[in-house]
Amino acid sequence: MTELVGVGLGLRREFMDAFLNAETHPDFIEVAPENWMGFGGRHAKLLARCVEKAPLICHGLSLSIGGPHPLDLEFIQQVKLFLQRYQVQIYSEHLSYTHDGGYLYDLLPIPMTEAAVNYVAERILRVQDILGQRLVIENVSTYLMPNAEMPEAEFVREVLLKADCELLLDVNNVYVNSVNHDSDAYAFIDAMPKDRIRYLHVAGHEQVEKNLLIDTHGAAIRDPVWQLLQYSYQVCGVKPTLLERDFNIPSWAQLQTELSQIKIMQQQGSRNEGKANILSHNATTVL
């Protein structure tokens, strides 16, 4: 298994030509399988060319892991074939639901209850059994928390442990939720099982009101998210980190600048980890 490292980029058709023609590339790329499954010909060849430049991981949109309706087994089989075709070792999905009698075109929050933990965990286990690999779930941005019986961090942690799955820690979503629900973003990071974190997402958001942020993926990363990313590296270790940019897409040069900023922060975090390990070893030796 190839280990995921470094800084990745969510691949979008708007800058695919620039990506293919670039002299240097991100350490990995990510696509939503729904946007590519079933396509052959030119589209399949285009994606294959991209995969030659950087390893591919997948971030799904419509599994609806928390939805009220039965899992779409045919869809899951299609995802499995896509993962096999492109040798994708990481498939992540949102801890939310997207179907309720029809596709809702949004990521809706799951009630944070013990019953929901058990329900979602059972569905994740079923998906993992079909795919033959661990599912990676992502904490989502929310604007309401219906019928919550527990804090978000506890809910996410319980699902991870009960389903024996992994976490895509979206740092921007953590910050957005901390503002929207008046919670502590740093405490959320502290509460996550560090050994379950497979990789991170960062993105920009829009401030609509003083206490309302929208996760748009349509702007540069904001300073508070940079600070939270740095903290995540400090307490969780330096994890592979992917930049998402879906709207108001800037030039390729600007995207590369933001990727470079993440890389610099990772390098600094790795140096700090090394110093901490040396200090810990010296302290043990003295004792």
Swiss-Prot record:
InterPro entries: MbnB/TglH/ChrH (IPR007801), Xyl_isomerase-like_sf (IPR036237). Pfam families: MbnB_TglH_ChrH (PF05114). Gene3D superfamilies: Divalent-metal-dependent TIM barrel enzymes. Belongs to the UPF0276 family. PANTHER family: UPF0276 PROTEIN HI_1600. This is UPF0276 protein ACIAD0933. It comes from Acinetobacter baylyi (strain ATCC 33305 / BD413 / ADP1).
